[in-house]
Structure formats: C-alpha cells, structure tokens
Regions:
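Surface-exposed peri-terminal alpha-helical interaction modules
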Residues: 2-282
Length: 282
C-alpha cells in the first residue's frame, strides 16, 4: 500500500449478524468446544496432535458412512434404488476423503511416532467399533471381531445386531430374487452372522444383468455402485496398510495384531465376489 492509498474497507457489512448473545452460533450448532476438547494428548510431543486429529476425522467420516450405509440398505429393501444410489455415491466420496487423510498422517516419520507410541498402551484402530460396524454392514462378518468390545455392553449389542442382520450385499441379492432371478434360498435365507460365500447362481444372475444392461438398467447401476464402493474401500485399506508400514514397518500393532500382515489380509477378501467374477465371464 502506497502513502496515498487507503486501507481496504472491512468485509463485514451492515447485514452481517454480529449481535449473537443468546442466539444460535456456528460454534453452538457444531458444539465446537466439546469437539475440540476431545483432543487430549498424553504427551507434549508435536506429532501426537496430528495422530489424534487424523483418527478423530476418520471416526467422524465412519459415523457418516454408517449412516449412509444404513439408509442404502433400508432403501434397497423397499425397492427404492435411486436414493440408495445417492447414499452409495456419497460413501465413495467419503472414502476418497478418508484415503487423503492417510496422506496427511504419512508426514509423520517413524521417529516422530516413537516419541509417543508407548503411551498408547493397548489402544488400537482394531478396536474402532464404527469401523467394525461399517465392515459388518458391508458384509465382512466375523464374530470374533466382537471380542474386543465385550467390555462395553451398548457397543457390543450394536455390533451384534449388525453381525446378525442382512448386510448391503444380502439385501441386493434379495432384490435380485424379488425381480425373478434364480437366487437360491441358501443365499438369501442363511445365517447372516457369517460372510457370504461366492455362488455360481449369483454370478450367473449378475451375468444376465450385465449382458442385458438396458433391460435391467437399475440393477446394472446397482452392481456398478457396489463395485465402486468396494473399489474405494479396498483403496482405503491399502493406503492404511502402506501408511502403517511406512511408519512402523513390520512391528506388531499396539492392539496385539501382526500389524501390516493383519491389515494386508483384509485385501484378500471381497465384499461382493460375484461382481468381480462377472468381469472374467463377460
């Protein structure tokens, strides 16, 4: 600014609400004081703030993802596919954000993490009940994953309900059956507490959808939304695994798991196996 120039005028105009005493504010609505107070580092190490923030952000996204997943399942059960597609598309965008979060955490070096890792005790992302809830609703059922939550009756009950009820792929296969496709009762009327096992009959049903996508366009779109969702979810898992490897190598996890090996094993299991098998058959 030269000597002859005036300072810029304030961007706060007469219409901006500034008398907020006793009124709902941005901070009130979002309960920011409560949210920000939840970050309580156990050390004075600089990168512990990053570590806590990343995991808080991931948990908030998982909470929204679970909300959208429940909505998608309910809408598919009611043959309301367009709103289900919207929820599924939103979930893929959520996963994009969650993947980006690993890139931020990757700025923490092994030495940075070692400055406070010992303070974590047995706490581990393995114990994230929201992540487990999402996995169960996606179809990755494993009753042993309830064990870390036995100490919390309310959380355990929520997870047990998700374990025992149909997941996203189950309700999608029920929809195929309602539409007249030859889906065996053993697929749609089974013990939902165990993972879906790939079925030739299910693969053939999806193959029929793909080979006549114009006739079955909404089911074709459902299939592609499911594939998108699994693709992004597996990318998130992969980035998680590689971030852990980058920071701790092949050390055991704080929760007692094998660390990278445990995370890598999840990549070998598909949520929707027949939708991937169809691609070879086409």
């Amino acid at each position: 600014m030269t000597a002859n120039e005036s300072p810029p005028e304030s961007r706060i105009g007469d219409d901006i609400h500034v008398d907020l005493a006793g009124r709902m504010t941005y901070g009130d609505y979002l309960q920011l004081n409560t949210l920000l107070a939840a970050k309580k580092p156990l050390t004075n190490k600089h990168d512990e703030h990053l570590f806590i923030t990343i995991h808080h952000v991931q948990e908030l996204w998982l909470n929204l993802m679970a909300h959208e997943l429940n909505s998608a399942i309910a809408n598919i059960e009611q043959d309301q596919l367009p709103p289900a597609f919207k929820s599924m598309a939103r979930m893929t965008r959520i996963l994009e954000q969650m993947i980006t979060a690993w890139n931020v955490l990757s700025t923490m070096t092994p030495s940075d993490y070692l400055e406070f890792r010992s303070e974590l005790g047995q706490s581990s992302g393995l114990q994230s009940y929201q992540y487990r809830l999402v996995e169960f609703r996606m179809g990755a059922k494993d009753a042993k994953m309830l064990l870390p939550h036995r100490h919390d009756a309310e959380v355990h009950a929520r997870l047990k309900a998700a374990l025992d009820t149909p997941g996203l792929y189950d309700v999608s296969l029920m929809l195929l059956k309602r539409r007249g496709f030859d889906i065996p009762d053993s697929v749609t009327e089974r013990d939902y507490s165990v993972r879906h096992v790939a079925s030739d009959a299910v693969r053939d049903a999806w193959l029929k959808v793909y080979r006549d996508s114009k006739k079955y366009f909404d089911l074709y779109e459902l299939a592609e939304e499911l594939v998108d969702l699994e693709d992004w979810f597996q990318q998130w898992r992969f980035r998680h695994m590689k971030t852990v490897e980058r920071i701790i190598g092949f050390k055991r996890g704080t929760g007692g798991s094998s660390g990278v090996g445990f995370l890598k094993s999840a990549l070998d299991h598909s949520f929707f196996p027949e939708l991937w098998a169809v691609r070879t058959e086409l």
